[in-house]
Every structure is written in structure tokens, then in C-alpha cells.
UniProtKB/Swiss-Prot annotation:
InterPro entries: PPIase_dom_sf (IPR046357), PPIase_FKBP_dom (IPR001179), Trig_fac (IPR005215), Trigger_fac_C (IPR008880), Trigger_fac_C_sf (IPR037041), Trigger_fac_ribosome-bd_bac (IPR008881), Trigger_fac_ribosome-bd_sf (IPR036611), Trigger_fact/SurA_dom_sf (IPR027304). It catalyses: [protein]-peptidylproline (omega=180) = [protein]-peptidylproline (omega=0). The lineage of its organism: Bacteria, Bacillati, Actinomycetota, Actinomycetes, Micrococcales. Residues 166-245 form the PPIase FKBP-type domain. Keywords: Cell cycle, Cell division, Chaperone, Cytoplasm, Isomerase, Rotamase. This is Trigger factor.
Amino acid sequence: MKSAVENLTPTRVKLNVEVPFEELKPSIDEAYKTVASQIQVPGFRKGKVPAKLIDQRVGRGYVLETAINEGLNGWYQEAVQETGIRPLSRPEVEITEVPDPTATDGELKFHAEVDVRPEIELPDYSGIKVEVAAAESSEADVDKALDELRGRFGTLKSVDRPAADGDFLTIDITASIDGAEVDSASGLSYQVGAGTMLEGLDEAVTGLSADEDAIFDTTLVGGDHAGEAAQVKVVVKSVKERELPEADDDFAQLASEFDTLAELREDLAKQAAESKVVEQGVEARDKVLDKLVELVEVPVPASVVEEQLEQHFKAENSHGDGEHDTEEHRAEVKANTERAFQNEIILDAIADKEEVGVSQNELIDYIVTTASQYGMDPNQFAQIIDQSGQVPMMVSEVRRRKALAVVLGQAEVTDSEGNKVDLSDFVRPGGEEEAAEAEAAPAVDSDAVEGEAATEEAAPSDDPAAVKF
């Protein structure tokens, strides 16, 4: 078999393949067996019909067509291996020549157009310089953390006053379009200022007391009338404020392992300082990635991006989030997908250059960490990703994290005050970023984790938009 690559664009090639008759013949022999098992001829058992009789009954041309259909993918895969291309999408195949059905020689010729991973030239990435914010925590950070902790132990208390920011309300709402009621809901709980329901709701309820109402104009975001302008009436049924426990030694004993408030504040101060270091590491990681993308031109195949977009919005629609399929949101998702693809290509190239590997223990650690993010048993999670074919994707993800850790380890990072930043607490000895576990979205299809069937990708490695740094 002969195969040759014709470059169409930096991300698309045409694979020209020629299969000689001697390599086509085994497929023809198998095709005769297939056809023999499909037809019935008096005097012959099923599957035992002679080839000459098959030619008379269905024609040798049909047998040849069957042989080509059954063997085409194998010849394509062989050509991919021979040429070393790395496909990202399913090929568009066109058969240009077939042997004469009446002859015993000739060639099968076809070409396949397919998107491929672009080849890039890596720059010198040692000593990349970035500046990050100073990792300084303050008493205000401790106070904020303490208030958040008190909030977890707070109680709601009814108040006889107008609603204010942060209050908790029970409300009834009714939506009307052109004077006709289209939707309503009663007994909804809502925190003033949350901004999680309807645009304009916070302004409408602020200043209302129990049993008072207001009418405001807004755009509906769910249901049959999503995206339509409507007039909404909101009735406040109750107003409650959160009553926080006193910050004292008793609270420290209730909410923590410490006996005194001073000890609790000391621990919160330590956590705040560690959090600032993690934030600093995340900022350094993101800025190093930004620098790499600036230094390397990575062409992005449009068809791959479009496929990812369709998969994204198909998943959103299946979960009832179709109202978010707007032009603005599509542009945002498209930009994020393109950037994620560029990150993947660059980090894969660095991993190749640095000969980065992934040990079984590193993969297990990553699976355990990701499982905890989903609140799942690691063994159950591992079984799900194995059944959905996502293990190679996770291996690639760990490998990219290690590649990024290599670059981070060589980067020159200073804070806004000119101090050199030590990332040793952020980058693990094994190469995986400490903060990436919490900050980066897991490169696992959440639909598969929830038990839905994962879509099998044509790419030889993994989903090109899966890396979410």
C-alpha cells in the first residue's frame, strides 16, 4: 500500500492512498464469506455458497463494494500510521478509483481529508518573566473569613422593616406578557442582592416590607417564554435577616477545634496567608500560559472548534440551559475553546520535548483528587471514566500539568513589590500544580460522570478543548 500526505492548510491534510489488488484480495475473500452468509441458494448451506454462484446471483461488483466498505477504515488507519499524521476529526473520504470487477488486478485509490494537530516550533521557554500580585494577607482577610464562618452558624430571624441588601425573603412572583399571565411561582426563597433570579428583582424588592408588592419590567430566562420581555409582579411575604453568633471563645469551640477566639483567628490568618500564596501561584501559572501563547503561533482548525461548540450547547440544551445559547455566549465559548486548544498543543509539545511521562501512582492520585471534587468514591469514579473511555484523556491532562510545572519551575516570577516569588509550595515535586486541583476544572466529561454515555472522539489523544487552565 502506498500513502502520501498533501498539506492543505497548517491544520488540514489530504491523505492519498493506493491499495494494490494483492492487498485488496483478503478483503474480497472476506466479502465473499459475508455475502455467502446473507443469501440463500437451494442446494447449499448458508455460508457455503461458492464464489462463482455468488457472482451470478449478486454480481462481483457488489462483492467488491462490500470488500471496500469493510476494509476502508483499516487502510485509512494504516495510512495514518505510515504517514505519522495526528488526526483531530473524522476524515472525509472520497474513492477515486476501483479495480475492474471483471479483472483480477488493478488498484483501489482514495483520498481522505482530515484535520490534524498542527506542528509548532517551540521558543526558548526557560526564564519566562512574569509579575504577580504580592501575597499579603491582612486583618481584613481574617475578619472576612471569620464572618463567613459565623454565617454558617447563623440563624434567620423575622424583622418588621423594609428589605435591605443581604436579607432573606419569601416571595410570590407573577409574569405577564401583554397583560396575559404566562407564569407564576409562590413561596420562593431569595436573598436580596444575590442576582440569581430575574434582572431587576433586587431593585424591586429593596425597600419593601412584608405584604408589599412591586412591578418591574424584565426579560424571562426560563420556561416557554425565555428571552421574551415581560412585566413581573413580586409580592414580599416575609423578611428575615441572618443573626450571627457572637465571635467569642464559645463560638470558637462550637465552630472549630480551638478553645479560644484568639487561636481560631490565628488559624484563619494562617489559612488566609496560604490562600494568598495559592492565588499567587495560580496567577503565575495563568500568566506563564499567556506568555507561551504569545510566543507560539498555534493555528486552530475551525471544524474542530465548531464540533466542540455544538457538543457544548447540545449538553446545555439537554440540561435545560438552552436560553444561554446566545450569540454573545457562543463567542465567549468559542474564544475559550480556541484558547484551550492552543494550551493543549503547546503543552503537549513541551511534554514531548521534556520527555514527560505519567506514572501509575500519578494517575491514581489525580483520579482520587478529581473524584473528591465530584464527591464520589474514587473506585466508582475510576470505573466510570474507564467505561466511558476517558482514561487516556486523564493521562494527557496529568502530562500537560507536569509539562506546565516544568515551565513554571524555570520561570522568573516576581511580585508587584519586586520580590522574587518561590513557587515550590505551588508546584509539586512530581510536577503537578498544587492549586490546579482546586482552581482548574477537571478534564472529565461531567455527563459521563453523571452516568450518561460519553461521546467517542476521533482524535487519537483526547478532546482538544478539554484542558481548562
